[in-house]
């Protein structure tokens, strides 16, 4: 059987060999193909500011723009900095079509630049079918940063549900969940991407990496708030805290995102671990 480098993005079944950064490009491919099966393909917008461990992501996206545009309209813009890219992410949700999936990428130190934009985006919500997903590169060991960095506290303070892939395959599985959750609730979601996962590579079983997404039974009609200002923001924050976040928790429960392993072992002590 002939194997080509393009198979990492083109192959639709079986297994593919991907690096962590390549898996992020494949995530967009999977999202678009999933939409095509459902009969409505969202547009995709990607912007950010490169940095370890996501260095080179922008170039790989540009390399595959022709393929991505064959599957659905895709726009990539190099961010002047992290803040302008985050502002552009929110700006995509103003599209009249309401069908833009926006991805922001940057390292942890860049995430520290954007809490204002992310908080405003969380209050505004997303377009009718749109989503906003942050791809945060975590340089815990200060591989190419002035100091070690992590995005956890910034994301938590902005009430951003954060998925934490432990391997390359989980970038696809949890990335698709991040898009689906943002589309359903209107919240900004994030993928926490650590250096060993981004710099690593592995063979990914595509069937196992594609989740069966289950939405809560409660029908939720999200609203996109074009203007967030003064007292008008108060009911938006109430909606975020009292309606959207409980729906986030229900989504996580239904889709078994936080898995319990060996629960029947009869032990008295449990260990909680992320990633």
Predicted features and spans:
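Thiamine diphosphate
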Residues: 1-168, 194-196, 256, 260-268, ...
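Flexible, low-complexity linker and terminal segments
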Residues: 1-31, 165-275
């Amino acid at each position: 059987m002939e194997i080509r480098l393009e198979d990492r993005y083109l192959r639709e079944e079986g297994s593919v060999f991907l690096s962590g950064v390549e898996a992020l490009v494949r995530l967009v491919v999977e999202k678009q193909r999933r939409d095509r099966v459902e009969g409505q393909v969202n547009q995709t917008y990607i912007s950010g500011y490169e940095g370890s461990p996501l260095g080179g992501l922008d170039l790989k996206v540009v390399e595959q723009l022709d393929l991505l545009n064959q599957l659905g309209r895709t726009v990539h813009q190099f961010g002047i900095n992290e803040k302008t890219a985050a502002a552009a992410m929110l700006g995509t949700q103003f599209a009249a079509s309401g069908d833009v999936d926006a991805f922001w990428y940057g390292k942890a130190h860049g995430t520290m630049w954007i809490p204002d934009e992310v908080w405003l985006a969380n209050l505004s919500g997303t377009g009718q079918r749109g989503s906003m997903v942050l791809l945060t590169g975590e340089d815990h060991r200060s591989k190419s940063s002035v100091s070690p960095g992590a995005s956890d506290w910034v994301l938590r303070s902005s009430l951003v549900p954060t998925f934490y892939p432990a391997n390359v395959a989980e970038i696809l599985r949890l990335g698709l969940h991040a898009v689906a959750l943002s589309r359903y609730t209107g919240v900004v979601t994030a993928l926490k991407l650590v250096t060993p996962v981004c710099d690593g590579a592995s063979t990914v079983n595509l069937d196992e990496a594609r989740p069966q997404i289950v939405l809560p039974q409660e029908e939720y009609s999200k609203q996109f708030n074009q203007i967030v200002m003064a007292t008008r923001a108060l009911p938006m924050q109430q909606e975020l805290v009292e309606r959207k976040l409980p729906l986030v928790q229900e989504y996580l429960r239904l889709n078994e995102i936080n898995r319990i392993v060996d629960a029947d072992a009869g032990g008295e002590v449990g260990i909680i671990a992320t990633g």
